[in-house]
Amino acid sequence: MWRQKTSPTAEPLALEEAKLHLRVENAEDDALIGALISAARESSETFLGRMIPERQFEIVLDRYPEMPYRLPLLPAKSVESVVCTLEDGSEVGLTEGTFRLAADDRLVVDAWPEGTPRTYDAVTITVTAGTETVPARWKQAMLLLIGHWYEHRESVNVGNIVNEVPQGFEMLLWPDRVVPS
């Protein structure tokens, strides 16, 4: 399980970029468009298996993982801390130098602490993950979603022929998708 510790400081698309794509000139729908930008980013992150933009997360594991441990949040930029909770409830933070971020977003721990780990929430890893730059393809995919959601605000489209935008969202993101191994 993982949870976000810090929120994005900015979205990968500016409000003005989305409004230009939507051909919206007034400020009446700015709050809605801002929410659509966030939702499109989150959908893109889910599809890609990558975080956009960089921020901090906690990964909580129920046992000591096998090494090297492939971090589920990509791309991993740094590992700030690794804290182990033992059976008696005490917490042991691994010291700097006993763990490291290796190639391919893998965490390497030289040695786990003495003692039996707790059977749930045994390891908490604090990691910074995310992209610094967003490729144009990713932005275009997000704009396609935003445009679709802005025009179709209900979950059912009645009275129209429904079809997928040819070569749309998935085609733009597919080359950079990370499939868990």
Where do the PLM segments sit?
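Divalent metal-cofactor coordination and adjacent catalytic microenvironments
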Residues: M1-S181
